[in-house]
Each structure stands twice: as structure tokens, then as C-alpha cells.
């Protein structure tokens, strides 16, 4: 599988964790920006060239706000990415989405920079 340098993937547990650092969301938002769509388009190309792989799309948030709202927001982030890929032509059977809310931060939520990193979507290839 040929992968962009910015993309580290876990494929059948042979690679390390997967994250797209540039796929970060504004606070309290699950709207895809133009820059987010460009990153997702890279995933689309990978899926187009490698029809044997599937993707788990994981949504995450920072810890600002209520836990339940953050959980729903993270689910909506993952679903927005999934729906975008489906609109591009990826079969829904190759995509799963899940939201974790604030349960799996990449960085401690101690400042705005760390919190921005935690408002993200990760892609797991399986």
C-alpha cells in the first residue's frame, strides 16, 4: 500500500496508531473545512487504489463542555467524514465511524494548542 508521508496507519496491527494531524476541527464544530476535505481526499485516493482495505473513522474532542455533548460532537465529526467519503463514491460497507468524546486525548487539555490537537479525527485501516 502506498501512503502519503503525513499518514501513519495501523494496518492489521503492523503499523503504529493512525492520525491525520491536519484534520483538526474548530471548537464545538463538526463542519468540514476546505483544508479538511483535501486531507480526506487523500484517504479517498488510498481507498480507491486499495479496494481491499476498510477504514474506521474515530472522532475525538477536547474536554470543554458537557461529556454527553462532547460524545455526540465526536460522533458527528466521524460521521461527517464518513458521509463525505460516501459522497465521493466509497462504499458505506468499507467505512465505520465511532466517537469517543473527550475520553482519548492525544495531549493533556491544559492549553488552547493541546485542546486543538484533541479536536480531531483519526483513521484506522483494517
Which sequence ranges carry the predicted segments?
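Periplasmic OmpA-like peptidoglycan-binding domain that tethers envelope proteins to the cell wall
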Residues: 30-38, 50, 56-126
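Periplasmic peptidoglycan-binding/tethering modules of Gram-negative envelope proteins
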Residues: 1-54
